[in-house]
Amino acid sequence: MSKVAEVLEIVKGLTVLELAELVKAFEEEFGVSAAAPVAVAAAPAAGAAAAEEEKTEFDVILTSAGDKKINVIKVVREITGLGLKEAKELVDGAPKPVKEKIAKEEAESIKAKLTEAGATVDVK
């Protein structure tokens, strides 16, 4: 059995506390650090970018009806299929979601229609 294989077998038999002691001993003996601060700092940024790329469902939030409330109610009815009363309640109760968990293209299209009607809209 080679030296490397022997050391590996010994390490396999160690407890977690013994492994922690071994790491400390290596750090002291060879003047190195087991921590990798550069890799740890870069990981969250990469993770955040991946999370943004993976987002496939969006919510269209009506934040304000603006001055042309009647036009906004008409567009909300067209988009949601709600009745007049329900659409008016949604518009009056802003900020409220108009549509949830939809594709980005559809969300942008709805935002454009509502903005054109005079509303203030967020896509999240």
From Swiss-Prot:
Which terms are listed as keywords in the entry?
Ribonucleoprotein, Ribosomal protein
Q: Which NCBIfam families match?
A: L12
Top-rank taxon: Bacteria
What family is it from? Belongs to the bacterial ribosomal protein bL12 family.
* Gene Ontology CC annotations of this record: cytosolic large ribosomal subunit
Function noted in UniProt: Forms part of the ribosomal stalk which helps the ribosome interact with GTP-bound translation factors. Is thus essential for accurate translation.
Subunit annotation: Homodimer. Part of the ribosomal stalk of the 50S ribosomal subunit. Forms a multimeric L10(L12)X complex, where L10 forms an elongated spine to which 2 to 4 L12 dimers bind in a sequential fashion. Binds GTP-bound translation factors.
One Pfam family of this protein, by short name?
A: Ribosomal_L12_N
Protein name (Swiss-Prot/TrEMBL): Large ribosomal subunit protein bL12
Does the record carry NADP as a key word? no
Q: Name one GO biological process term.
A: translation
Q: What is the phylogenetic placement of the source species in the record?
A: Bacteria, Bacillati, Bacillota, Clostridia, Eubacteriales
User: Could you confirm whether the keyword Ribosomal protein appears in this record?
Assistant: yes
Species for this entry: Desulforamulus reducens (strain ATCC BAA-1160 / DSM 100696 / MI-1) (Desulfotomaculum reducens)
Task: Recall the GO molecular function terms of this protein's record.
Answer: mRNA binding; structural constituent of ribosome
